[in-house]
Amino acid sequence: MHQKTIAELKQDLRDKTISSVELTQHFLDRIKTINPTLNSFISITEEYALTQAKAADARLAKGEATSLTGIPIAQKDIFCTKDIKTSCGSKMLDNFIAPYDATVVEQLNKAGAILIGKTNMDEFAMGSSNENSYFGAVKNPWDLERVPGGSSGGSAAAVAARLVPGATGTDTGGSIRQPAALCGITGLKPTYGRVSRYGMIAFASSLDQAGPMAQTAEDAALLLNALAGHDAKDSTSINKNVPDYTATLTTSLEGLKVGLPKEYFGEGLNSSIAESIETVKKTLEKMGATFIEIQLPHTDFAAPAYYVLAPAECSSNLARYDGVRYGYRCDKPVDLDDLYKRSRTEGFGSEVKRRIMIGTYVLSAGYYDAYYLKAQKIRRLIRDDFMKAFETVDVILTPATPTPAFKLNEKIADPVAMYLSDVYTIAVNLAGLPAIAFPAGFMDQLPIGAQLIGNYFEEARLLNITHRYQQETDWHKQSPKLR
């Protein structure tokens, strides 16, 4: 049962071959058995999930089902969930019970999905390996000695291990796509503003975007149908009609123009991944796509610009955690200054503190022009590169990561090496574009991911191409050998 996709489970529920309670209990039992090995969940909401599942069965019996009625999903622990702990992977919020639901949570509730638990993540979404969590590292289900990627590593590992059929993630510099690639699942980062950020704990507000993580493009489309849309509570949410993302999944790829940027195939790319992308190219060509070599000349500046801009926004956003209003508070502070210093020193992990320090530095009066302003100019040039490319191509094909999943603790002491694991995903966030990562092969029993980048609000096209590709391949059907 756990090998089935959301689309298949949805049909089973409609056909009454299984109830939502049975389905939810099956996944809860699987989580209890396997999660202690993977550490992909921070909270498991068993009682709440079974209550929701009973209500879903009642709606199904009355013929009142909505798009995801009865389907268990997991929420990344960055989304506020009313009366359920929302930790953001941090000691700072270990005791935080949100008084309201994030819009992402609200939308999936409206669609009828069952919240089965909150997934582990890098603290405040800062990381590429899920080793920065206060609740311990998540392990990659394909190799328990390797990372699942980050920051949405818990969601990626849970979907890959079939502990849940779908989950939410957030993507600030690749945090949906990189773990999706390393765990062999499908992950979509929508256009900036397509999905509401209300109730999503902020890391870098001009870069953060929520999106779906699932086995297939079809499942990602079903989840995005529920997630996407304008929200007046989020000032960055864009008021644009939401199409039915499942309606165009089977559209022909005849005449599709795909760009191959030479900057993404240079030094640092594992040769097996390069070969897998070439195989994706040949598969799409057989379906009618044509390929054009393009240039994205400012690609090499994306990572340096990102690691100025994201920490700058992080230092501002995380200033609110001071031990006064909510979150961790140190014991017996001698005065207000001591309260601030010790609460933040004890409450934040080392990577978060590193980024706050970098951000404070680049925003300081003497360095603002030299770093922050220059990075913003580079950001515009990167966006312009993409806009020029989209004058001649419909989408862009690249690797999702330079290597397969690396060993736990391999890069934790070398921040630059860790940061470069997102080298193929960062530019997309700087430009605010949509992109999807999907399974494209294996190397030494480890998944390889490809990435498609689209123009603004062209999520439907990305899902269509990925779905058609998945009809011709079975990489997405592979699952790790767990109990």
Curated annotation (Swiss-Prot):
Name by which UniProt lists this protein: Glutamyl-tRNA(Gln) amidotransferase subunit A
Gene3D superfamilies recorded: Amidase signature (AS) domain
Gene Ontology MF terms in the entry: ATP binding; glutaminyl-tRNA synthase (glutamine-hydrolyzing) activity
Disulfide bonds: none
GN (gene name): gatA
Keywords annotated in UniProt: ATP-binding, Ligase, Nucleotide-binding, Protein biosynthesis
Any single Pfam family the record assigns to this protein: Amidase
Protein task: Allows the formation of correctly charged Gln-tRNA(Gln) through the transamidation of misacylated Glu-tRNA(Gln) in organisms which lack glutaminyl-tRNA synthetase. The reaction takes place in the presence of glutamine and ATP through an activated gamma-phospho-Glu-tRNA(Gln).
Highest rank taxon of the organism: Bacteria
PANTHER family found in the cross-reference section: GLUTAMYL-TRNA(GLN) AMIDOTRANSFERASE SUBUNIT A, TRANSAMIDASE
Similarity-based family: Belongs to the amidase family. GatA subfamily.
One Gene Ontology CC term in the entry: glutamyl-tRNA(Gln) amidotransferase complex
Annotated EC: 6.3.5.7
Annotated GO biological process: translation
Description of how the protein assembles with itself and partners: Heterotrimer of A, B and C subunits.
Active site per the UniProt annotation: K76 (charge relay system), S151 (charge relay system), S175 (acyl-ester intermediate)
Reaction(s) catalysed by this chain's protein: L-glutamyl-tRNA(Gln) + L-glutamine + ATP + H2O = L-glutaminyl-tRNA(Gln) + L-glutamate + ADP + phosphate + H(+)
